[in-house]
Regions:
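Conserved hydrophobic/aromatic "anchor" residues
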Residues: 19, 48, 82, 201, ...
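Glycine- (often His-adjacent) and acidic-residue-rich active-site loop
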Residues: 13-47, 60, 88-90, 173
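Terminal peptide-recognition signature
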Residues: 12, 24, 51, 68, ...
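Crotonase-fold acyl-CoA enzyme core
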Residues: 46-159, 191, 196
Length: 214
C-alpha cells in the first residue's frame, strides 16, 4: 500500500475526460445491493493516516463525488461539476455520500445536496464548505501537485494525529477527542520530526525544518 511504499501524501486524480461520472446505471437492478464492498474501500481511504487530496475536473457525480468526499481535501477546476445525483433515478447515495457531505456542509445543506440531486458548480460547494479550493482549469494539475508536495514534505506523524482527532471529534464529539488527545500527542512527542522541527527552530527560525516523515 501507499504507507508501505513510503508515500507521505496521496493525490487522487483522473487522466480521463472526467474525474468520475459515476456508476453505469444500465447494470443496476432492484437487488443492486447496498454498496457495502465499495464503501469499505472508501472507509479505508478516509482512514489512511496520510493526507489525501482529490483533484476534480470534468464531472464528479454519484459514486465519483463520494470518492472525492472520502479524501481530506478536494480541489476542483472551475468548470467541474459535482453532485450526488442518485435520486434522479430513485436511488440514494450508497458509498457514504450522505454522511460525508453532511459532515462537511452541515445537516441542512447536506440534505439539500443529496435530495435535490443537482450538479453543482465548485464555487458554490466551496462556499458551503464541501470543497477546499477552486482553481482555473489549466491550473488544477500544478495546484493540486503543489498541495500534495507541501503535505508530503510535512510532519507526517503530526498529520496522522490531526486526522485521528478530527475523525473522533466528528464521530464521537469534542469531549471524546479531548480524551484521545493525550494518546495522539504522545506519538507526536516521540516523533523524530518534532525533534527536527525544534532544532531547526532554535538554529534558524520557524518554517525551516526538513521533515522525514518519522
Amino acid at each position: 500500500g501507499a504507507i508501505d511504499s513510503g508515500a507521505r501524501a496521496i493525490l487522487l486524480k483522473s487522466n480521463m475526460k472526467h474525474f468520475s461520472a459515476g456508476a453505469d446505471v444500465d447494470g443496476f437492478g432492484a437487488d443492486g445491493g447496498d454498496g457495502s464492498p465499495a464503501i469499505e474501500v472508501l472507509d479505508r481511504l478516509a482512514a489512511i493516516p496520510l493526507p489525501t487530496i482529490a483533484a476534480v475536473h470534468g464531472l464528479a457525480l454519484g459514486g465519483g463525488f463520494e470518492i472525492a468526499l472520502a479524501c481530506d481535501f478536494i480541489m476542483a477546476s472551475a468548470s467541474a461539476r459535482l453532485g450526488l445525483v442518485e435520486t434522479s433515478i430513485g436511488l440514494m447515495p450508497l458509498l457514504g455520500g450522505v454522511q460525508r457531505v453532511v459532515e462537511r456542509a452541515g445537516m441542512a445543506r447536506g440534505k439539500e445536496i443529496a435530495m435535490f440531486g443537482r450538479r453543482h458548480d465548485p464555487e458554490l460547494l466551496e462556499r458551503w464548505g464541501v470543497i477546499n479550493a477552486v482553481v482555473a482549469d489549466d491550473a488544477l494539475d500544478e495546484a493540486s501537485r503543489s498541495w500534495a508536495q507541501q503535505l508530503a514534505a510535512g510532519p507526517t506523524v503530526a498529520y496522522a494525529a490531526i486526522k485521528e482527532l478530527a475523525v473522533i471529534a466528528s464521530n464521537e464529539g469534542v469531549r471524546s477527542a479531548d480524551q484521545a488527545q493525550e494518546g495522539a500527542a504522545q506519538k507526536v512527542w516521540a516523533s523524530e520530526d518534532l525533534q527536527r522541527g525544534l532544532e531547526s527552530f532554535s538554529e534558524s527560525g520557524p518554517g525551516t525544518a526538513i521533515f522525514q516523515g518519522t
